């Protein structure tokens, strides 16, 4: 496994790069926008393809690099379901997994620092964002923070992990880089409490100033969605009601760009072909499966994903490869369900033997 911990000295933010093998896919956690060039140089040097970029919560102390990384690499952006950002490609709930080749993280919903905070567990380590720091914890006095919720997140979820679990936080202000669950239980001064009320009293009396970039960072981080307003993309963006009129038409090929776990959790539009977003590029080049299917006389291709970001990016790529008879479902399956569109359970994949 490839693992790198990177540090932004301005915001004291830790960013993490993970990959299963040299030359494989990579995932980045909590990127800072000013460091994007560095984040892109490192995977290039290691022969990695950035597949996913993840934020543990909506940050108040720096502007996220999620949007810029997506624009420059076409990676999938990931956040928790509770994050009130305009658009991300994939949203996770408690217990869901985010996966790339050779790496799997389990999402833990840990509200308290914010109401959209998540931690991510991977084998022997946990990425705690701003929920649990080294000898400290994330503040709870803004962004719908809740000290009692933070107490439950820490004591009922994080501190129940194996004692040797490595703790990799989203920030550090003293030069520490890693801890363990056992160390934090024993030595973190904010965790030497007997109740949620006692913890809430500590947090209420911290008297911390607001983060310097808060008034800029929070609005920016709520608006990281892909700009699908180019005339070409806008003309090929269909609302859910319009798409429903095409359902069942042999001339329209519905293509689901989501991952298998999303399909199993949320269902599919009936009659959809499954082609995960990460596999799209090879399939729209000359000789590719989707390119061949799109070339059939009278055929149109309708792309959809969870919220419309992956499908808009895919639409751009299809147009760039000369496939003009394509469109996408604006707002993705989320908009489809809200409009009352039919959903079915996908058939399980069968293995030939």
Please tell me what each predicted stretch does.
Residues 152-166, 170-241, 245-248, 252, ...:
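Accessory terminal helices/loops
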Residues 31, 58, 82-83, 113-114, ...:
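Active-site metal-binding loops of divalent metal-dependent hydrolases
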Residues 12, 23-25, 33-109, 186, ...:
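Active-site HxH/HxHxD metal-binding segment of metal-dependent hydrolases
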Residues 5, 17, 97-122, 160:
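Core dinuclear metal-dependent hydrolase active-site scaffold
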Residues 1-49, 119-129, 135:
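Conserved beta-strand hairpin/beta-sheet module of binuclear metal-dependent hydrolase folds
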Residues 230-303, 346:
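Positively charged, proline/Ser/Thr-rich regional signature most characteristic
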Residues 27, 52-54, 127-128, 168, ...:
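Residue-level marker for buried hydrophobic side chains located in beta-strands
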Residues 259, 275, 286-338:
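Catalytic cysteine-centered active loop of the rhodanese-like fold, especially the PTP/DSP P-loop
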């Amino acid at each position: 496994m490839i693992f790198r911990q990177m540090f932004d000295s301005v915001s004291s933010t830790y960013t993490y790069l993970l990959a299963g093998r040299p030359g494989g896919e990579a995932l980045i956690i909590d990127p800072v926008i000013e460091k994007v060039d560095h984040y892109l140089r490192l995977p290039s040097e290691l022969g990695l393809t950035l597949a996913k970029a993840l934020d543990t919560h909506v940050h108040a102390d720096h502007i996220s690099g999620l949007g810029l990384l997506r624009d420059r690499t076409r990676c999938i952006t990931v956040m928790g379901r509770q994050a009130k950002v305009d658009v991300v490609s994939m949203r996770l709930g408690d217990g869901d997994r985010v996966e790339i080749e050779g790496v799997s993280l389990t999402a833990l919903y840990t509200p308290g620092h914010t109401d959209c905070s998540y931690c991510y567990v991977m084998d022997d380590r946990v990425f705690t964002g701003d929920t649990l720091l080294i000898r400290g914890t994330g503040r709870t006095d803004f962004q719908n923070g809740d000290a009692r919720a933070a107490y439950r997140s820490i004591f009922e979820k994080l501190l129940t992990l194996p004692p040797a679990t490595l703790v990799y936080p989203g920030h550090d202000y003293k030069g520490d880089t890693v801890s363990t669950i056992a160390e934090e239980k024993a030595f973190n001064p904010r965790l030497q409490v007997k109740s949620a009320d006692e913890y809430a009293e500590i947090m209420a009396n911290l008297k911390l100033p607001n983060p310097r970039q808060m008034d800029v960072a929070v609005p920016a981080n709520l608006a990281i969605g892909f700009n699908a307003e180019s005339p070409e993309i806008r003309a090929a963006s269909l609302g859910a009601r319009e798409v429903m009129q095409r359902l069942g038409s042999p001339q329209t090929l519905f293509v689901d760009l989501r991952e298998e776990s999303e399909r199993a959790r949320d269902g599919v539009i009936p009659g959809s072909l499954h082609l995960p977003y990460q596999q799209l590029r090879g399939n729209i080049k000359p000789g590719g499966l989707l390119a061949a299917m799109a070339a059939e006389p009278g055929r149109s291709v309708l792309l959809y994903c969870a919220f419309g970001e992956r499908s808009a990016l895919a639409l751009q790529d299809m147009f760039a490869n000369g496939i003009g008879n394509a469109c996408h479902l604006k707002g993705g399956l989320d908009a489809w369900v809200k409009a009352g569109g039919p959903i079915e359970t996908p058939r399980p994949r069968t293995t030939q033997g």
